[in-house]
Amino acid sequence: MTPGELRRLYFIIHTFLSYGLDELIPKIRLTLPLRIWRRMLFWMPNRHQDQPLGTRLRLALQELGPVWIKFGQMLSTRRDLFPPHIADQLALLQDRVAPFEGKLAQQQIEKAMGGLPVDAWFDDFSVEPLASASIAQVHTARLKENGKEVVIKVIRPDILPIIKADMKLIYRLARWVPRLLPDGRRLRPQEVVREYEKTLLDELNLLRESANAIQLRRNFEDSPMLYVPEVYPDYCSESMMVMERIYGIPVSDVEALEAQGTNMQLLAERGVQVFFTQVFRDSFFHADMHPGNIFVSYEHPEDPQYIGIDCGIVGSLNKEDKRYLAENFIAFFNRDYRKVAELHVDSGWVPPDTNVEEFEFAIRTVCEPIFEKPLAEISFGHVLLNLFNTARRFNMEVQPQLVLLQKTLLYVEGVGRQLYPQLDLWKTAKPFLESWIKDQVGIPALVRAFKDKAPFWIERMPEIPELVYQSLQQSKQLQTSVDTIVRDMHVRHVRQGQSRYLFGIGAVLLLSGTLLFIHRPEWGMMPGWLMAGGVVTWLIGWRKTH
C-alpha cells in the first residue's frame, strides 16, 4: 500500500471507531493481538454513545465522503443483509455535497465540446449550479439553435481517481468481514462490493444514462402516467449530458401537491401502474426512483402525471424471471406456499436438489403471520424481502436484477403510501399481473409468437432443403463414428481380457519357478526357464494393453 492509501485507511478505521462501530464485531472475534493493535494505533472513545447503532453508522459514512455515502445508500436496499433499524438509517443518507466551482464546470463542458467555448452551443449559461451531487452537478442554459431551456449535467473533475482509491480500500475491508463477523461468509461482502463498483462506474458514463433516458421516454411516449424529459444526444458525451429542463413539484412535497388540488389517490395508483408497466410490459425499469428523482407536473392536477429524471441506474428482467415473479406474487397472496416453493426451484433461483417440503414449511412459517394484517397494509417489498431471506437459507444465489427490483418496489410503495395512506397496492397490481400472465399463454400468445418468428422462418425457408441434407450427412457421419467407437471398445475389451489371462499365466510361471528354485535345486535349469517364461508372458500381456 502507498503512504496515501495507508493514511486514508487509518482515517477510515479511526472514523469507524470514533462512532463505536467496533461493537458490530463480536468480542469473541477480537483476539488479544487485535485488541492491543486497536488500542495502540486507533485509540478513540465512542463520542456518540447516546445514539443508536444505525444512526452512528449513517453519520460515519457521511463523514467519510461521497463514495461511502453512495455505498451506504446501496446497502440500504440490501435488507437481506441488515436488520431494519440499520437499513432504515442507511436509507436516510443524502447524496448532497458542496458544488465545485462553476468556472471549473464550464471548463469541463468546453472540454466535452471539443475545446469550443460554451457560448458556441448555449446561451444564458448559469455558472451557479442548479443541483450538486457526489458524481455530477447540473447547470442551466438555453440551446443556441432553438432557444429551448436545458440542463447540462457534467461529471465532477478528477472523481475517477478518488473512486478507484476508495474502492480499493473497500475491497480490502470486505476481505476482513468473513473473519470478523460470524455470518460474514453468507453476506458475500466482496460480491456486494463488486455490484456497487459496477453501479458506480456505470453512473460515470453519461452516454449510458442518455441512452437509458431515451429508451424510457420512447416507452412512455404520449402516456398520461409518466413524462421523461427529452435528451439531446448530439450534445452528449461520456462526461456531459444535455436534456430538456422540466418544472414540477417534488413528489415528496405532499403539502404543495394538495394545495394545487392534485388527485392523490390517482397519483399513488399511477405510481404502481408505472412500475408494473416498466417491469412487465417493457422489461426495462428505472431503478433509482427515490423522491429526489420524481416530480409531478403542474398541469392537470385532477389527472396528474409523473416526471422522471436521472436514469443512471436501470434494471431489466428476462421473460422467465417476469413469469416466475408474477406467479410468485399471485401464489403468495393466494397463500399457496407449495406453489411459491416450486416456482423458486423451477426458476433456478434455488438449487434443483432443494427439499420442496422443507422449503414450503419455511416459507409458510415466515410469511403466514403477514396475513394477520389487512391486504391493503401488506407491503409488496417486504413480501419479496421475506421470500428472498427464506430462500437464501436454502442457498439462493444473489440475483442482482431482483435486488434492483425489490429496491425500486420499496421506493414506489413508500412514495405511494406517503401520497395516499389508504393505497391498496395488491388491489391495484393484481389485475395487471393476472392480465399479463393470461397474455403469455394460450392462443393469443401462440399467434403473437408466430408473428414475431414468421420473418425469421420466411428468411430461412430457402435454406431448409440444404439444412436437411446436411443433417442427414452429419447423422451418417455420427453413426460411422459411433460404429468405430463401439468396434474400438470391443477390441480394447478383448485385449484387456487377454492381458488379464496372460498376467495370470505369467504370475503362475514366476511363482512356480521361484518355488522350484528354492525347494528343488536338483531340477537344474527348469526353474530358470519357468521364471523367464513368466516374465515374457507378462511383457506380452503389458504390450496388448498398450
From Swiss-Prot:
A GO biological process held by the record: ubiquinone biosynthetic process
Single GO MF descriptor: ATP binding
Source organism, top-level taxon: Bacteria
EC number per UniProt: 2.7.-.-
EC class: transferase
Localisation: Cell inner membrane
Keywords: ATP-binding, Cell inner membrane, Cell membrane, Kinase, Membrane, Nucleotide-binding, Transferase, Transmembrane, Transmembrane helix, Ubiquinone biosynthesis
Pathway assigned in UniProt: Cofactor biosynthesis; ubiquinone biosynthesis [regulation]
Domain Protein kinase: 124-502
Keyword Ion transport: no
Transmembrane segments: 501-521, 522-542
Transcription among keywords: no
Membrane-protein topology: Multi-pass membrane protein
InterPro entries for the chain: ABC1_dom (IPR004147), Kinase-like_dom_sf (IPR011009), UbiB (IPR010232), UbiB_bact (IPR045308), UbiB_kinase (IPR050154)
GO CC, any one term: plasma membrane
A Pfam family hit: ABC1
Amino acids binding ATP: L130, A131, S132, A133, S134, I135, A136, Q137, V138, K153
Catalytic machinery residues: D288 (proton acceptor)
Function: Is probably a protein kinase regulator of UbiI activity which is involved in aerobic coenzyme Q (ubiquinone) biosynthesis.
PANTHER family: CHAPERONE-ACTIVITY OF BC1 COMPLEX CABC1 -RELATED (PTHR10566), PROTEIN ACTIVITY OF BC1 COMPLEX KINASE 7, CHLOROPLASTIC (PTHR10566:SF113)
Family: Belongs to the ABC1 family. UbiB subfamily.
Name recorded for this polypeptide: Probable protein kinase UbiB
Species whose genome carries this gene: Klebsiella pneumoniae (strain 342)
Gene that encodes the chain: ubiB
